[in-house]
Curated annotation (Swiss-Prot):
Organism, as annotated: Drosophila melanogaster (Fruit fly)
Protein known as: Protein pelota
Any Pfam family: eRF1_1
Molecular function GO labels: metal ion binding; RNA endonuclease activity
Subunit structure: Component of the Pelota-HBS1L complex, also named Dom34-Hbs1 complex, composed of pelo and HBS1. Interacts with Pink1 and Cnot4; the interaction with Cnot4 appears to be Pink1-dependent.
Necessary cofactors: a divalent metal cation
Tissue localization of expression: Expressed in ovaries and muscles (at protein level). Expressed throughout all development stages.
Taxonomic lineage of the native organism: Eukaryota, Metazoa, Ecdysozoa, Arthropoda, Hexapoda
Length: 395
């Protein structure tokens, strides 16, 4: 998504101008636009013209309209977002208050104004417009003395760092100089990974090289991680994958990304963290049910006690038409983050999001047991107590 303009003041009033550039951007737009927002974009309108003789003709004209959104329809096949509402700005072709349907398409600019912006909507814009926010995969292509640290998104590859170090040749009597040069090179590559790879977003890090360079670097990196207590690397060791590449130049990425093993690893990167969180929830539900709850009522009660370690919430809940209910969910997310908890926002378009929807779209893993929540009466059908009817479809 391309951000052309953003004017949101401290009172959370204002507008943004965006251009969707790929299909995923239309999904972001669908999550951003809500009933009651105003959207301005170019459109085609059928206009009736009366001639001097009294007869009428119709023609199609391109114009720019601003509508107050009343309904939203997302056609995933055609990748078109249809917004229906009343015209709210003077226009030579369309009367004030007349209904019109705006079709938002790829590469068509639109301006979005909300009665009040919130943190979830602003985060969605940041994620959609910052390519590093959506880069699920990082890759280091390397050979002795040369490395490229890259981030890979659905549409582009970004070279975040190029490392070049002159390494003395391995000659008789000068092996030590060669090893010193290699250590210097490996250290710079490791520091570049720590600096440029956001492990909260990146789900897979490919280390690729000809020969044994990748293996030697991998061993060096995790020896140093243990020695220097680099928890970021140690906690994410499972995300690293060693693969063959013909060189340390960027063009070697093509062959790497065609490797069936790499493709299999990458196919699940988009929501790997969410899948893992959901698996942990189901496991906790079976082993320690007093530390796993789903349903709005129980989750809110746990949040009041600052007991939530991880919140699992569907993006579908932020699309609700009830403004006060949306605010309640936004406040919940903010309060959990303020208390040091983690929030996983699931896409309802992913299989893990569909599973979460079966648990009312909201669930939580707790820091400590709250058996009193299990005992609390729940007359609301939308809420479920931990240890109840949840069923894992992990196959």
């Amino acid at each position: 998504m391309k951000l052309l303009g953003k004017y949101v003041d401290k009172g959370m009033q204002g507008n943004v101008t965006l251009v969707p550039e790929e299909s995923e951007d239309m999904w972001h737009a669908y999550n951003l636009i809500a009933k009651g927002d105003s959207v301005r974009s170019t459109t085609i309108r059928k206009v009736q013209n009366e001639t001097a003789t009294g007869s009428s003709t119709s023609s199609r004209v391109r114009t720019t309209l601003t509508i107050a959104v009343e309904s939203i329809d997302f056609d995933t096949q055609a990748c078109v977002l249809r917004l229906k509402g009343r015209n709210i700005e003077e226009n030579q072709y369309v009367k004030m208050g007349a209904y019109h349907t705006l079709d938002l398409e790829l590469n068509r600019k639109f301006e979005l104004r909300k009665p009040e912006w919130d943190t979830i909507a602003l985060e969605r814009i940041e994620m959609a417009c910052d390519p590093t926010q959506s880069a699920d995969v990082a890759a280091v292509v390397m050979q002795e003395g040369l490395a490229h640290v890259c981030l890979i998104t659905a549409s582009m590859t970004l070279v975040r760092s190029k490392i070049e170090v002159s390494i003395p040749r391995k000659r008789k009597g000068s092996v030590q100089q060669h090893e010193k040069g290699l250590a210097k090179f490996y250290e710079q590559v490791m520091q570049s990974i720590l600096r440029h790879v956001n492990f909260d977003v990146v789900k897979c890090v490919l280390i690729a090289s000809p020969g044994f360079v990748r293996d030697q670097f991998y061993d060096y990196m995790f020896q140093q991680a243990v020695k220097m207590d680099y928890k970021l690397l140690l906690d994410n060791k499972s995300k690293f994958m060693l693969v063959h590449a013909s060189s340390g130049f960027k063009h070697s990425l093509r062959e790497i990304l065609q490797d069936p093993a790499v493709l299999a690893k990458m196919s699940d990167t988009k929501a790997a963290g969410e899948v893992k969180a959901l698996e942990q929830f189901y496991m906790m539900l079976q082993c320690e049910p007093a530390k796993a709850f789903y349903g709005k009522k129980h989750v809110l009660q746990a949040a009041e006690s600052q007991a939530i370690e991880t919140l699992l919430i569907s993006d579908n809940l932020f699309r609700c038409q009830d403004v006060s209910l949306r605010k309640e969910y936004v406040n919940l997310v903010e309060s959990i983050r303020d208390a040091g908890g983690e929030v996983k926002i699931f896409s309802s378009m992913h299989i893990s999001g569909e599973q979460l929807a079966q648990l009312t779209g909201i669930a939580a893993l707790l820091r400590f047991p709250m058996p009193e929540l299990e005992d609390s009466d729940d007359d609301d059908d939308e809420d479920g107590a931990a240890g109840g009817v949840a069923d894992s479809d992990s196959d």
